[in-house]
Amino acid sequence: MSEHTITELLSPAFLSRMQNMLGDEYESFLKSYEAPRTYGLRVNTAKISCDEFERIVPFPVTPIPWISNGYFYPEDVRPSFCPLYQAGLFYLQEPSAMTPASCLPVTPGENVLDLCAAPGDKATALGAMLNGSGLLVANDISASRARALLRNIELFGITNAFVTNETPAHLGKHFPEFFHKILLDAPCSGEGMFRKEEALARDWTPEKSHELSSLQKELILQAADMLRPGGLLLYSTCTFAPEEDEEVVSHLLENRPDMELLELPEYEGFTSGVPEWGNGDPSLIRSVHLFPHKMQGEGHFLALFRKEGRTDLIGTMSSAKPNAETRKWLELFLKEIGLKTLGGQPFDWNRVETRKDKVYYLPPIGGDFRGLTFLRNGLYLGDLKKNRFEPSQPFALSLRKGDAEAVISLPVSDQRLTRYLKGETLNIEPEEAAHAKGWHLLCVEGYPIGFGKLVGQTLKNKYPAGWRV
């Protein structure tokens, strides 16, 4: 616990700048740092409706007014230990940080890029909107952060993601004018995160914003190059600095006359951008600041652009073909669990590919991915072993309620779920299992958490060690 209040850690230069920016609102802004933090979660609506989530969630939640699938939860709750979280039914996210993805109108079937995606806050939201159709490219330049990104995409059950670890410049060579929608949540000075991460407040310097502004201007131009005509680009930061906000927006408008700044949805507490904080372009008023003294959140900035021209949904379809051995053992497994659909969609054998005994389910939209550093192309289904197929944890999480017949569903209050998540074997009553033996999906309220193998009344735990709580 810090010995100092946040306001005591804030740089005088930061406070002076905020006073100049906010004028009469400055005192309210300063007092917001003394208020308790807000905690939020976002429901995975590709798996569960908000009404159903509210019915089964075992702790109190309150809707976030400006996010249709967002909820506040109390500070003393630990949602990550809840079986519903381990089933990928919700994601923990700071409330104002939910806003960028919610303001980018993604439609199933589109090609979507999250350029600086780790740890997956926005990518999981975009993937849920695509609902298994189209292509999500989730990229991060940091290898370690990209691994965290992959884990969250797998936890959310996203089947159509291409997770890359690339520089934006190299990515752009492979995807010129390829994406219908792009989200650029740029690396920033994090002024909207000071209450959450005190080190950011302690280490803040005026020079940091100027340095980051140069990077952000480079990134936003690279993003524009990858956006197809008629496509939308959402730029966001979690900072208040004009150098990283209005000035970056101005830079794009000055250098790309084919990009237009659009109006964002209005909500009480949204604050319009200030043209004078950029190059004076009157359209900067269409960008939006989220300040902590006006909303229940830490703070954010966002701007939505449209590229001139018309767009379409035409894309190259994936055309993999499983080898005979893969098809034989995978087909037997799918029959054993009674697979009806995968992620609510018919299983497509043309998307199955085997690489070194690992079986993948490719995104429905293909592309030229040669020469790119990637962690995952599509869904990792499992491994070919000697005379059998062994399913993966991402495969289990990609399945939705009703996708398979061989299930053991327990109520969210059942302590056996916690024991399963710790790697323990479970005792299962005959009436609780769909079949007398074999592979089953263990579910919470019908929503898959992971696989197990039933032998008599014992469910052998197949929850991987690296996923256990």
PLM region spans:
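Polybasic, low-complexity RNA-engagement segments
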Residues: 1-21, 25-54, 298-301, 308-469
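Conserved AdoMet
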Residues: 39-98
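Conserved class I S-adenosyl-L-methionine
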Residues: 109-118, 137
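Conserved SAM-binding loop of SAM-dependent methyltransferases across substrates and taxa
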Residues: 119-132
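Helix-to-beta-strand junctions that scaffold the AdoMet/dcAdoMet cofactor pocket
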Residues: 130-131, 227-229
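S-adenosyl-L-methionine
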Residues: 139-177, 184
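Mobile active-site "lid"/loop adjacent to the S-adenosyl-L-methionine
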Residues: 144, 180-221, 238-245, 271, ...
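Class I S-adenosyl-L-methionine
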Residues: 179, 232-235, 240-360
